[in-house]
């Protein structure tokens, strides 16, 4: 999922620099300390560069995305049925990759900007982008989030579930229910003529009365030929940000993240795993959703696989 950064706060205005003095010192510093370019996804090598802007999918593209979404849904359904205490998140990653490939697709996540696995596996206070590890055991009472994507014939399907491992606490169970309810509250707003902020408002209004919080800096997104396409799909109402009108043929990944405590997060030393700042539990659900002529269609519906 994409992260929103306030770049405008970083780019402060400065007085004009005389050309005869050469390159501005700040430009030299920016070049010297610029972060390395992200590692491009290795799959597929012949992939065309994604078109800019919000994409309206053709019927042929939608048919392929149904298959990509069904593969992602099938893998998550099997993981949910397989996971048990004593397994490791690395075991689940191996299962996911083998099943994605056996179903004729490739993992969307593996190699994406250098991410080393086919799933993101987050336990308890971990929010997003958890790296699966062979030594990381899953225990009874854990709240396990598994996010995966399948790349099939040039298009992606993206979905996430939260799994209660064994018997979880009442608080964990309630958090799961709220996170999933928030997802479907947002999905119910998907129809032609509505706007992205209708989705965001429905999610926000669903979560706010519960006392839980929504992680604001991570958003949903468009999905298709690229794993992350325009537009950003916000989970809270935002001012001064694009409020796109929904049209048939749009495909969106809607994915609210709900915390039991503070909404704020921090990133661990592996530069991927994001956790809650107060170690509170976190839950997430995600579907890839198609805007149809009359409403919506879930492309990652686990009930249909």
Swiss-Prot record:
GO terms for cellular component: cytosol. A divalent metal cation 1 binds at residues 147, 158, 286. It comes from the Bacteria. It catalyses: Release of N-terminal amino acids, preferentially methionine, from peptides and arylamides. GO terms for molecular function: initiator methionyl aminopeptidase activity; metal ion binding; metalloaminopeptidase activity. PROSITE patterns: MAP_1. Keywords: Aminopeptidase, Hydrolase, Metal-binding, Protease. Substrate binds at residues 129, 228. A divalent metal cation 2 binds at residues 158, 221, 255, 286. NCBIfam families: met_pdase_I. Belongs to the peptidase M24A family. Methionine aminopeptidase type 1 subfamily. This is Methionine aminopeptidase C. It comes from Synechocystis sp. (strain ATCC 27184 / PCC 6803 / Kazusa). The lineage of its organism: Bacteria, Bacillati, Cyanobacteriota, Cyanophyceae, Synechococcales.
């Amino acid at each position: 999922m994409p992260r929103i950064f306030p770049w405008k706060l970083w780019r402060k205005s400065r007085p004009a620099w005389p050309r005869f003095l050469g390159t501005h010192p700040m430009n030299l510093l920016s070049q010297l300390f610029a972060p390395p370019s992200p590692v491009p996804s290795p799959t597929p090598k012949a992939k065309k560069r994604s078109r800019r802007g919000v994409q309206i999918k053709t019927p042929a593209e939608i048919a392929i995305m149904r298959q990509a979404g069904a593969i992602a849904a099938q893998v998550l359904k099997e993981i949910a049925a397989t996971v048990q205490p004593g397994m490791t998140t690395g075991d689940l990653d191996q299962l996911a990759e083998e099943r994605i490939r056996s179903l004729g697709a490739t993992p969307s996540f593996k190699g994406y900007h250098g991410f080393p696995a086919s799933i993101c596996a987050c336990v308890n206070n971990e929010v997003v982008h958890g790296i699966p590890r062979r030594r990381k055991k899953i225990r009874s009472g854990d709240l396990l989030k598994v996010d995966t994507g399948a790349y099939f014939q040039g298009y992606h399907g993206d979905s996430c579930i939260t799994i209660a491992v064994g018997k979880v606490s009442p608080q964990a169970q309630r958090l799961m229910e709220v996170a999933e309810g928030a997802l479907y509250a947002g999905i119910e707003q998907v129809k032609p003529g509505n706007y992205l902020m209708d989705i965001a408002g429905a999610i926000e209004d669903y979560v706010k009365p519960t006392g839980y919080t929504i992680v604001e800096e991570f958003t949903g997104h468009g999905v298709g030929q690229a794993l992350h396409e325009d537009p950003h799909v916000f989970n809270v109402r935002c001012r001064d940000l694009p409020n796109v009108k929904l049209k048939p043929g749009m495909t969106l990944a809607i994915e609210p993240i709900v915390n039991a405590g503070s909404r704020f997060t921090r990133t661990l030393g592996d530069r991927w795993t994001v956790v809650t700042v107060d170690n509170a539990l976190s839950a997430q659900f995600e579907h890839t959703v198609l805007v149809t002529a009359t409403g919506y269609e879930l492309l990652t519906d686990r009930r249909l696989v």
